[in-house]
């Protein structure tokens, strides 16, 4: 059975260092896809780079936890900014869902305006689209537009509630992160997916060169380690040996 592997680099547009790291991991490594924060400080730079790489799949990284929203969100922002208090609001079930749905549509249009095309797929910064209150909004939005969606099936309460026409990979892994940034970890992810019989798999990553913006992130220097592993010749060989075909969300 042919298996499609999508190695998706999150945070395109966050900074120039992030952008250059993703491009390096695509040109000289195993990254096949990326997702862009349309409110990122380097989003225009990301769009410029992507025009030189037409085969790189570029999706949208829906943002509700960082920077300024595209639309007015008085119910979610503090001093005009988004932040991680969204977790507390989700626990208290006080999320402004109408504002979130509107912001999703506005970020989507912003993506089209900047990149000149629709995104290949949707996911989100800090996985907020997997919140039980937010997931139905994003799932319906993706299904209506015929674009794929990152789904962490371990967190979906009821897979039967997914729209029948919603596209996603059969498997998803966020394990290549933090203390587990090794070639062995990456290949274990592939082996586990193959053991489950999944025909398609997305592996999330965050390769980057460190700049002043990345230094402000709690997840800083591990991005350099990710870049080193993702551009290793032995990892590329290990993927090929396992029969995976590199692809993007346009291949599922």
From Swiss-Prot:
Example GO molecular function: deacetylase activity
Domain of life of the source: Bacteria
Pfam families with a match to the protein in the record: YdjC
Names of the cofactor(s): Mg(2+)
Group of enzyme by EC: hydrolase
Gene3D superfamilies referenced in this protein's UniProt entry, alphabetically: Glycoside hydrolase/deacetylase
Stretch forming the signal peptide: none
Keyword Magnesium listed: yes
GO cellular component: cytoplasm
EC number: 3.5.1.105
Location in the cell: Cytoplasm
Main location: cytoplasm
CDD domains in alphabetical order: YdjC_EF3048_like
Assembly description: Homodimer.
Function: Involved in the degradation of chitin. ChbG is essential for growth on the acetylated chitooligosaccharides chitobiose and chitotriose but is dispensable for growth on cellobiose and chitosan dimer, the deacetylated form of chitobiose. Deacetylation of chitobiose-6-P and chitotriose-6-P is necessary for both the activation of the chb promoter by the regulatory protein ChbR and the hydrolysis of phosphorylated beta-glucosides by the phospho-beta-glucosidase ChbF.
Stated name of the protein: Chitooligosaccharide deacetylase
Organism: Salmonella newport (strain SL254)
Gene for this chain: chbG
């Amino acid at each position: 059975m042919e298996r499609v592997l999508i190695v998706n680099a999150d945070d395109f547009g966050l900074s120039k260092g992030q952008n250059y790291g993703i491009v390096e991991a695509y040109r000289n490594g195993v990254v096949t896809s990326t997702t862009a924060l349309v409110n990122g400080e380097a989003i225009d730079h990301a769009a410029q780079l992507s025009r030189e790489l037409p085969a790189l799949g570029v999706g949208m990284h829906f943002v509700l936890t960082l920077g300024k929203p595209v639309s007015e969100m008085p119910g979610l922002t503090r001093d005009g900014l988004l932040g991680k208090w969204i977790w507390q609001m989700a626990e208290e079930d006080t999320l402004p869902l109408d504002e979130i749905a509107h912001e999703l549509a506005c970020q989507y249009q912003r993506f089209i305006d900047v990149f000149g095309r629709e995104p290949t797929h949707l996911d989100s910064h800090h996985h907020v689209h997997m919140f039980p209150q937010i997931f139905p909004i994003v799932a319906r939005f993706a299904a209506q537009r015929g674009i794929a969606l990152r789904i962490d099936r371990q967190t979906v309460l009821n897979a039967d509630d997914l729209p029948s026409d919603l596209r996603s990979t059969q498997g998803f892994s966020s394990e290549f992160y933090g203390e587990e940034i090794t070639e062995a970890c990456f290949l274990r992810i592939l082996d586990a997916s193959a053991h489950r019989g999944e025909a398609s798999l997305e592996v999330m990553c965050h390769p980057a060169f460190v700049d002043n913006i990345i230094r402000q992130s709690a997840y800083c220097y591990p991005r350099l380690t990710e870049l080193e592993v993702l551009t290793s010749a032995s990892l590329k060989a290990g993927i090929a040996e396992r029969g995976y075909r590199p692809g993007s969300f346009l291949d599922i």
